[in-house]
């Protein structure tokens, strides 16, 4: 089915050529299964990552509205905030970031290195809060305060995950389908599932373009019971915006995020080291390390529906390695 309605939405060309889809020969040999990787860690701005796909749509909407300031929120080591700040710098916009310390650490590297260091390089106005208990409300309050200072703010939700931002991953599904056509028939796709926009966009796009592929979201912050409504709500909102039906079930694995968001665990760090040592590719402790841990354990435990090739969607995050180096 066509995704032609995507073209109705304004989009900034921030990424350019499709990101690579590569075969991982040494990891495949190690796991006894064909593993491919979609390299969204190589998007061209600010050390890469998946949020740039969402920001192509969100920043275009901000410019359409005449905004001169992008406001968003996340953890101190948020990849999304880092990429939003970079886009703001590229477009000549002010950026205000509302940050929390979700793991309650006083470690200097977490507080000032990695993504947080890059925010300073992008001249981001950083506001700290005790916790993002109601980020939508907190962002609206911040926007009101910034507007009173004479700015024209545009609020971008946590992770860039709303129906507009998630269109970036419908676009990514189109890229994946085109790259796989005539080359490989993927049986399963694995992606980290956090703020839910990436997962929901892929769910809508892959249902239309690669319905044979099983999509698995490995949660990085919530149980299935808490995450499922978020993904389903966004999946339906994205489908509605494109005048599509979204009937595919959402599959989530929540066995790999403990002890919680932003806190590394043993299996996640083992996955980070494994991919670095076998393929020279950097994962991160918060998202992709835990998602890869799910992929590895899923093969071991025979959790996948069949034994065909698996595609891992690499959403980026390597700058956070410098904030977590004691765990390495």
Curated annotation (Swiss-Prot):
Swiss-Prot/TrEMBL keywords: Lyase, Pyridoxal phosphate
N6-(pyridoxal phosphate)lysine PTM positions: 51
Superkingdom per UniProt: Bacteria
One Gene Ontology term from the biological process aspect of the record: D-amino acid metabolic process
InterPro entries assigned: ACCD_DCysDesulf, D-Cys_desShydrase, D_Cys_desulphydr_bac, TrpB-like_PALP, TrpB-like_PALP_sf
EC code: 4.4.1.15
Cofactor(s) this protein cannot do without: pyridoxal 5'-phosphate
Membership in a protein family: Belongs to the ACC deaminase/D-cysteine desulfhydrase family.
Protein task: Catalyzes the alpha,beta-elimination reaction of D-cysteine and of several D-cysteine derivatives. It could be a defense mechanism against D-cysteine.
Complexes and interactors: Homodimer.
HAMAP family xrefs: D_Cys_desulfhydr
Protein name: D-cysteine desulfhydrase
Taxonomic lineage: Bacteria, Pseudomonadati, Pseudomonadota, Gammaproteobacteria, Enterobacterales
Gene giving rise to this polypeptide: dcyD
């Amino acid at each position: 089915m066509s995704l032609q309605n995507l073209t109705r939405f304004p989009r900034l060309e921030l990424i350019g050529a499709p990101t690579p889809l590569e075969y991982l020969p040494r990891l495949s040999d190690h796991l006894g299964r064909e593993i491919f990787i979609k390299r969204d860690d190589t998007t061209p701005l600010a050390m890469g990552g998946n949020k740039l796909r969402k920001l192509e749509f969100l920043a275009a909407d901000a410019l359409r509205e005449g905004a001169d300031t992008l406001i968003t929120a996340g953890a101190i080591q948020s990849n999304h905030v880092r990429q939003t700040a970079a886009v703001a710098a590229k477009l000549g916009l002010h950026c205000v970031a509302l940050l929390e310390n979700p793991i309650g650490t006083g470690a200097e590297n977490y507080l000032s290195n990695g993504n947080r260091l890059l925010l300073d390089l992008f001249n981001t106005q950083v506001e700290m809060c005790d916790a993002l208990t109601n980020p939508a409300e907190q962002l609206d309050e911040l926007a009101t305060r910034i507007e009173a200072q004479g700015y024209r703010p545009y609020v971008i939700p946590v992770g860039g995950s709303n129906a507009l931002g998630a269109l970036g991953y419908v676009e990514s599904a189109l890229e994946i389908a085109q790259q796989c056509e005539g080359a490989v028939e993927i049986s399963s796709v694995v992606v980290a599932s956090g703020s839910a926009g990436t997962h929901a966009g892929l769910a809508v796009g892959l249902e239309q373009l690669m319905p044979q592929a099983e999509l698995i979201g490995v949660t990085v912050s919530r149980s299935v019971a808490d995450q499922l409504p978020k993904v389903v709500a966004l999946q339906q909102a994205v489908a509605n915006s494109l005048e599509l039906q979204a009937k595919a079930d959402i599959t989530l694995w929540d066995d790999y995020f403990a002890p919680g968001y932003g806190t590394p665990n043993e299996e996640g760090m083992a996955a980070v080291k494994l991919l670095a040592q076998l393929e020279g590719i950097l994962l991160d402790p918060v998202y992709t390390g835990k998602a890869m841990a799910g992929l590895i354990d899923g093969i071991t435990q025979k959790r996948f529906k069949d034994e065909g090739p698996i595609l891992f969607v690499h959403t980026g995050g390597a700058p956070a390695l410098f904030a977590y180096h004691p765990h390495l």
